[in-house]
Amino acid sequence: VTRSRGWGLPLVVLLLAVAGGAAYLLVGPDDSDDPFASYCDAVVDHREDIGAARSAGAETGLLRALPAFEELADEAPEDIRDEWRIVVDRVSDLRDALDDAGVDPASYDPEKPPEGLSADQRKAIRTAAVRLGAEDTAAALSGVEQQARDVCKTPLSL
């Protein structure tokens, strides 16, 4: 007696494919395949901190948000890494200039700098502040905010 093998192998392959697909649907997709998963998790984790920090004002808020920005820059996917580097570098430069001068960012007034502040220290602070407010920094910050909305489906801050 000869058995027909015409449908045997294709039927087994079809059944295995259906079983595999059903298992995938039950378990769900694996986040390890998503290159943005850890970055988006970090965005969600830091939203409240960034929002609270930024409510303190332009430069001061960015200074307070710097630790969160640094973590997000470390988690950032390749396509937004350059923008994060600009943001972190510019905020860090202002922080460093203020720290080097021993100046409290919250109370610093460039029109009335503290006594004892040298011309070089004032210039370093002014230069860092101008670079932080520059068009390329604003574009980088806008880019990371847009990335959070588009890819992570959440704003960068509350």
Name these PLM-found stretches.
Residues 8, 22-68:
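Immediate post-signal-peptide N-terminus of mature secreted/exported proteins
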Residues 13-16, 20, 110, 115:
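N-terminal targeting leader peptides, primarily classical Sec-type signal peptides for secretion
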Residues 19-30, 133-142:
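Short, intrinsically disordered, charge-biased short linear motifs at domain edges
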Residues 42, 46-55, 106-158:
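C-terminal amphipathic alpha-helix
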Residues 46-106:
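Alpha-helical segments in soluble extracytoplasmic regions
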